[in-house]
């Protein structure tokens, strides 16, 4: 069977919009009746998802699978790096954790990893009409080019057409695009089919002279200028998209009742599972904000301690900022606190590391629970949209459990290892109703019909609508169906 076309969405920088544009293209092609699959050879993210067979992939690829109408699969993200302390990361290959690696270890094995990624992409191309690939970081990191896995290394191995996305909202986009084009090799440059300007605000006619000059300098046409899309906040891939002070979602607009709920999510330095926080923001009348100060912990109706890749280190950070005392006072006053993953572990009485250098630290002592951190990674898909990914095991539990025999509950304190639990609509409504009661907000009402899944699809449709309006997707399909080495000839421009 002939392989279907595939192409690569690369970006001049991290957070240029690659993940969102890839998701939007997947959605647009799926709506057009094409069998489309997402692909990211290598992802570096702590915001992961667990597949139905217990594998682990980047959360962005799970979202892109939803855009395609597919279940998440390890095929869509065969290599995942989960950054940890001391410049090391947990390496996940085809959904299974392989252990910790340092930068030198990873670079030495990148040739093998590139082969794994290329073979997986080829398998997808044989089964789908089109595969939309997402690059990683910047393709212009020439110091890493020899062993590149996710950008031009993959594009050369699979002969992919490449589109470079630049974020105009942060400034300097023309220099970013020109510099990326200039610094890479002639062989890689030949694969570039076009530039894409993302997050544009203002009058496009003011930008046009710059685009004309950019094409004169590079020989590459700007295929699309994508406007800034307000209120797109789905499945952040990394903490760059969750800065302190940022309000998540629509900001509690249109409450059904007479009162709102304010949620403060502590912005841990090494946090993961940001989608857990985002799930609450779909509810009318709920405002969710990332915070790192004592005042916000005092003043909010609910405080969330999210997941983290380094429970002990982030607990020390939390103490350094005085947040431990604020959380303890909240608990004494009966004000709601929710800990998820590593955040739940912090709420324990003690946390013991059973690794090579055993040690023990005091937790926040909000629960009569003792946690042991072990080398073994626990991954469980509960089949209801919730899942567990953690190294902590409960050695002692003296509390009422919270969710089907898991987690802990004491009055207004909630803790669980389950990520994604609040994406379940009835579960989220029950939880917020309890929070409102404990917070003294009887005038807050949950919506009977808000759907987290539906909101995400609506957001994906919004992105797809914008892409269809500002990028000729029929032309894009025609371009990527041609041989990659035909790029940037007069006939293809």
UniProtKB/Swiss-Prot annotation:
List of catalytic residues: 419
GO MF entries: ABC-type vitamin B12 transporter activity; catalytic activity
Pathway: Cofactor biosynthesis; adenosylcobalamin biosynthesis
The keyword DNA damage belongs to this UniProt entry's keyword annotation: no
Function according to Swiss-Prot or TrEMBL: Catalyzes amidations at positions B, D, E, and G on adenosylcobyrinic A,C-diamide. NH(2) groups are provided by glutamine, and one molecule of ATP is hydrogenolyzed for each amidation.
UniProt record similarity statement: Belongs to the CobB/CobQ family. CobQ subfamily.
Protein's recorded name: Cobyric acid synthase
Gene name of the encoded protein: cobQ
């Amino acid at each position: 069977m002939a392989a279907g076309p595939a192409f690569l969405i690369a970006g001049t920088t991290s957070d240029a919009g690659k993940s969102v544009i890839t998701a939007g293209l997947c959605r647009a092609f799926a709506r057009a009746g094409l069998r489309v699959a997402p692909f990211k050879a290598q992802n570096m993210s702590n915001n992961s998802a667990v597949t139905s067979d217990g594998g682990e992939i980047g959360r962005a690829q799970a979202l892109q699978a939803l855009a395609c109408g597919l279940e998440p699969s390890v095929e869509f993200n065969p290599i995942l790096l989960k950054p940890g302390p001391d410049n090391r990361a947990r390496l996940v290959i085809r959904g299974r954790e392989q252990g910790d690696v340092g930068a030198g270890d990873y670079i030495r094995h990148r040739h093998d990893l590139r082969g794994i990624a290329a073979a997986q992409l080829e398998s997808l191309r044989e089964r789908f009409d089109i595969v939309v690939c997402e690059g990683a970081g910047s393709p212009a990191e020439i110091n890493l080019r020899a062993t590149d896995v996710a950008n031009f290394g993959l594009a050369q191995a699979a002969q992919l057409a490449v589109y470079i996305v630049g974020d105009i909202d942060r400034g300097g986009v023309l220099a970013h695009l020109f510099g990326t084009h200039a610094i890479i090799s002639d062989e890689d440059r030949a694969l570039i089919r076009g530039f894409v300007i993302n997050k544009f605000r203002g009058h496009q006619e003011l930008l046009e002279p710059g685009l004309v000059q950019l094409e004169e300098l590079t020989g590459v046409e700007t295929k699309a200028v994508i406007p800034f899309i307000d209120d797109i906040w789905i499945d952040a891939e990394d903490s760059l998209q969750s800065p302190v002070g940022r309000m998540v979602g629509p900001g509690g607009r249109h409450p059904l009742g007479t009162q709102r709920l304010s949620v403060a999510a502590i912005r841990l330095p090494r946090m993961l599972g940001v989608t857990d926080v985002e799930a609450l923001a779909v509810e009318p009348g709920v405002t969710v904000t990332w915070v790192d100060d004592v005042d916000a912990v005092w003043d909010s109706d609910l405080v969330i301690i999210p997941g983290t890749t380094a429970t002990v280190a982030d607990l020390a950070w939390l103490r350094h900022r005085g947040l431990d005392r604020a959380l303890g006072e909240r608990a004494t006053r009966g004000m709601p606190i929710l800990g998820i993953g590593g955040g739940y572990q912090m709420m324990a009485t003690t946390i013991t590391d059973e690794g090579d250098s055993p040690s023990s630290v005091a937790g926040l002592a909000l629960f009569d629970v003792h946690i042991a951190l072990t080398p073994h990674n626990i991954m469980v898909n509960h089949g209801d949209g919730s899942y567990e990914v953690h190294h902590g095991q409960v050695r002692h539990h003296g509390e009422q459990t919270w969710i089907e025999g898991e987690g802990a509950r004491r009055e207004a304190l909630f803790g669980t290892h389950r990520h994604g639990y609040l994406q379940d609509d009835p579960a989220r409504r029950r939880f917020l109703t309890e929070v409102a009661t404990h917070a003294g907000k009887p005038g807050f009402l949950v919506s009977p019909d808000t759907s987290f899944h539906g909101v995400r699809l609506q957001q994906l449709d919004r992105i797809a609508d914008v892409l269809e309006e500002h990028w000729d997707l029929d032309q894009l399909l025609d371009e990527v169906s041609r041989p990659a080495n035909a790029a940037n000839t007069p006939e293809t421009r």
